[in-house]
């Protein structure tokens, strides 16, 4: 199949599946995705200066890919109080961050009102320094908080927005297929609940990212269905700011240790995800992020020539990928990020969470 035909023609699910399965045309595919990237966003590659605040690892969930969670009485369990979260946000602001990404495990005492207190405290603490964008709470956290507070999803999202939620990570998507989810994350929200929460957030004017975690127990057909669900949501709401493929970190994941999951995706599969998603999301989601935490510097540089146009954040403290066995560090300086981009002939630019260029 010649990928170039998708310059004019919309790709079907069947054709997307063929592109994932065909190893004879990978270089044509990557070259075509790179040309689409150039048409949509030019040669600018963006990054955000941000800090991740994972405020607790205590979690009642039982996701079988997660090596981050702890029970309340585990030795390594921790829970940052609201003052500590606010203090870290102020440190981030003083450091030059424009965003804090706040997420945590599903701690039994957390509800929507507690999440709202976190938002309020962070905005109040950072206001004297010019305030900070809060990117927080996955659809799973929103669902869990609402349930604990006895609220419906709409009410919960309204409260979070009123208290300063600026945008949401579209994590907890993993693979949007209930058979896969039953095996991978049995306690997590179902596909239709994830879709509903994302759409409600978009309707309220809360932009979100979209993600896909791949390389574990799923097949290519699941990737295709997942990507088309995201495409259909974007056609309806236009609320996704970016798509972030998340390559499965297998090393310490329980499901891998039990011998039930692959050892992550191959390098070629990683690159195919960038390329095919660039084709599927043509004209809909123009920002596709290659995560250096998951892929490492060199692989990100290749991804930037296969459809990706963003490298994510400086991410001071990325404890979730680290506990899963990511080997690429938890912080990259702005100088390193810019150098990584420049060395593949592209132009680095700092952006905000919502993709406003800052230079």
Swiss-Prot record:
[4Fe-4S] cluster binds at residues 59, 63, 66. Pfam families: CofH_C (PF19288), Radical_SAM (PF04055). Keywords: 4Fe-4S, Iron, Iron-sulfur, Metal-binding, S-adenosyl-L-methionine, Transferase. PROSITE patterns: RADICAL_SAM. Coiled coil: none annotated. Residues 45-278 form the Radical SAM core domain. Binds 1 [4Fe-4S] cluster. The cluster is coordinated with 3 cysteines and an exchangeable S-adenosyl-L-methionine. Catalyzes the radical-mediated synthesis of 5-amino-5-(4-hydroxybenzyl)-6-(D-ribitylimino)-5,6-dihydrouracil from 5-amino-6-(D-ribitylamino)uracil and L-tyrosine. This is 5-amino-6-(D-ribitylamino)uracil--L-tyrosine 4-hydroxyphenyl transferase. It comes from Methanocaldococcus jannaschii (strain ATCC 43067 / DSM 2661 / JAL-1 / JCM 10045 / NBRC 100440). The lineage of its organism: Archaea, Methanobacteriati, Methanobacteriota, Methanomada group, Methanococci.
């Amino acid at each position: 199949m010649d990928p170039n035909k998708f310059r004019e023609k919309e790709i079907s699910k069947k054709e997307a599946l063929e592109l994932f399965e065909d190893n004879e045309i990978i270089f044509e595919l990557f070259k075509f995705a790179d040309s689409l990237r150039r048409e949509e966003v030019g040669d600018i590659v963006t990054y955000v200066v941000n800090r991740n605040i994972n405020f607790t690892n205590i979690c009642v969930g039982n996701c079988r890919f997660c090596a981050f969670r702890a029970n309340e009485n585990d030795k390594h369990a921790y829970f940052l109080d609201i003052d500590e979260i606010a203090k870290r946000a102020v440190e981030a602001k003083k450091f030059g961050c424009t965003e804090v990404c706040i997420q945590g495990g599903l701690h039994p005492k957390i509800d929507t009102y507690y999440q709202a207190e976190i938002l309020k405290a962070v905005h109040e603490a950072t206001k004297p320094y010019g305030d900070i964008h809060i990117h927080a709470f996955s659809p799973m956290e929103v669902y869990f908080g609402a349930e604990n507070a006895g609220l419906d999803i709409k009410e919960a999202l309204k409260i979070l927005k009123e208290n300063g939620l600026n945008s949401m990570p579209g994590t907890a998507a993993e693979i949007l297929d209930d058979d896969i989810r039953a095996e991978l994350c049995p306690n997590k929200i179902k596909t239709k609940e994830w879709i509903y929460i994302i759409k409600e957030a978009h309707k309220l004017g809360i932009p979100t990212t979209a993600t896909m975690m791949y390389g574990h127990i799923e097949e290519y057909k699941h990737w295709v269905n997942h990507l088309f669900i995201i495409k259909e949501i974007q056609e309806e709401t236009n609320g996704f700011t970016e798509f972030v493929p998340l390559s499965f970190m297998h090393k310490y994941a329980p499901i891998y240790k039990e011998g039930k999951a692959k050892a992550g995706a191959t390098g070629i599969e990683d690159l195919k995800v960038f390329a095919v998603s660039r084709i599927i999301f043509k004209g809909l989601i123009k920002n596709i992020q290659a995560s250096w935490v998951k892929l490492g510097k060199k692989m990100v540089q290749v991804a930037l020539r296969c459809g990706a146009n963003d490298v994510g954040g400086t991410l001071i403290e990325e404890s979730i990928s680290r506990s899963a066995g990511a080997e690429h560090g938890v912080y990259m300086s702005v100088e390193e990020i810019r150098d990584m981009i420049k060395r593949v002939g592209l132009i680095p630019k700092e952006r905000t969470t919502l993709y406003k260029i800052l230079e």
